[in-house]
């Protein structure tokens, strides 16, 4: 009788252990799913189409483009203006130096520009879509929070990522591989929606972006009066 009780007890603990393991696996899967979708879920608008219906062009936001001789490369800042301050100016400078095509979506509000943030995998803006269809390489510039001056590099173009990281390190920039939630590996990310289906995304921390501007400020006045001499010092 005691043997049977021991067997039942052992079986009970085995089943309990299996159940606990199963629960842990489910929790981990759910956590990773939520982490992946977190940036999109916090956006006010599901995509650009929804944003456009609820906002006013040239009041809340504007789009600027520049067509260059080197049309094979497009430099973008889809969270420009007051959304991720400094990204428009930095992307424009890269475009000017390399003679690359340029695109930016800028938040123009005095406040609450973060409400105009549409994640890169849902940014279905028609002008950008047309540019991407005729582009072989894309360099997407973004802003990321952080008190240390760091460039996080991601995207599906490993060769281009390696080359950019190498050159940045030569200039004494700290370059790190992007964390999973901003790694830009999705085929739906605008960085990868070009002819080659791959591109590079650079996430520049707040501390790093401030270094490109006078007095280390990212306010609208400082950005609108940006000195390209100051930006050039970091090339």
Named regions from a protein language model:
Residues 5-20:
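N-terminal Sec-pathway targeting helices
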Residues 76-93, 97-98:
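N-terminal carbohydrate-binding/catalytic regions of secreted carbohydrate-active enzymes
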Residues 90-122:
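A glycine-rich, hydrophobic loop/mini-helix early in the fold
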Residues 17-29:
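Hydrophobic membrane-insertion alpha-helices, especially the h-region
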